[in-house]
């Protein structure tokens, strides 16, 4: 599929995969709660990682890894990366940021963040399917291009601009943004006036830190967002 065709074809998350993962997450949250009750309510994110991975009895293409390094954003509990190789196919890696989760973890918030993030990453999976192996073998994402640019003397902002202007990311982040809008007090107004709700829309705010409101990237983001919002 050519890029312009991909841009016209909105991808959806892999609902079958998400349903299977949700069962794993629900079981793991219950098991981790038992661990907390037996350990004076003191978080151990390595234990949470172990529980999540051990409950993946069907060996779904996902792995949870605890990251003990500090993050720039103290509220970033989780990050995830979708990948594809010709040998292994599609896969997603989820990083649990221990320093941010310890003492802050809550089961409902954890699940909401994780499932939304996996929705984002499985949109990438479906994009990969449409692109095909021939394209993927030589494809460089916006993030990869940004890393190259930064290594050549660019800035963190250059990297982020390259990452967020990637058409694949615009689509996947639009799905996230639609979900955030639906959680506001007035979802329809948030869709019409996202500037008014910037404080409640982390995805929109992230893009606004890089792009002006009338930019091509913001317009495309909001176009996809409206489609996801109404679906």
What spans do the regions from the language model cover?
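Zn2+-dependent metallopeptidase catalytic core
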Residues: 25-59
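Active-site scaffold of zinc-dependent metalloenzymes
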Residues: 71-113, 122-129
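Proteolytic processing junctions in secreted/extracellular precursors
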Residues: 3-9, 38, 150
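Post-HEXXH active-site segment of zinc metalloproteases
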Residues: 112, 128-162
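Long, well-structured alpha-helical subdomains associated
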Residues: 22, 28-32, 151-231
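Amphipathic, interaction-prone secondary-structure segments
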Residues: 49-83
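Compositionally biased low-complexity segments enriched in polar/charged residues
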Residues: 11-26, 37-43, 62, 84, ...
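Catalytic phosphate/metal-binding cores of nucleic-acid and nucleotide-processing enzymes, i.e., regions
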Residues: 117, 122-125, 131-138, 181
């Amino acid at each position: 599929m050519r890029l312009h065709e991909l841009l016209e074809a909105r991808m959806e998350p892999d609902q079958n995969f998400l349903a299977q993962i949700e069962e794993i997450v629900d079981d793991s949250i219950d098991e981790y709660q038992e661990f907390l009750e037996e350990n004076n309510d003191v978080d151990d994110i390595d234990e949470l990682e172990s529980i999540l991975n051990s409950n993946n009895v069907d060996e779904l293409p996902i792995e949870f890894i605890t990251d003990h390094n500090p993050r720039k954003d103290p509220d970033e509990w989780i990050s995830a990366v979708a990948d594809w190789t010709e040998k292994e196919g599609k896969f997603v890696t989820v990083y649990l940021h221990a320093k941010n989760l310890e003492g802050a973890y809550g089961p409902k918030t954890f699940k909401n963040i994780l499932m939304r993030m996996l929705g984002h990453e499985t949109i990438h999976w479906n994009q990969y399917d449409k692109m095909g192996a021939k394209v993927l073998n030589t494809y460089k994402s916006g993030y990869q291009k940004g890393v190259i640019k930064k290594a050549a003397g660019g800035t963190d902002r250059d990297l982020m601009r390259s990452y967020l202007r990637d058409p694949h990311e615009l689509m996947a982040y639009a799905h996230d943004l639609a979900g955030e809008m639906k959680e506001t007090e007035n979802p329809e107004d948030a869709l019409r006036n996202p500037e008014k709700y910037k404080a409640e829309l982390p995805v929109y705010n992230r893009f606004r830190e890089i792009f002006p409101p009338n930019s091509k990237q913001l317009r495309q983001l909001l176009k996809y967002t409206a489609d996801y919002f109404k679906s």
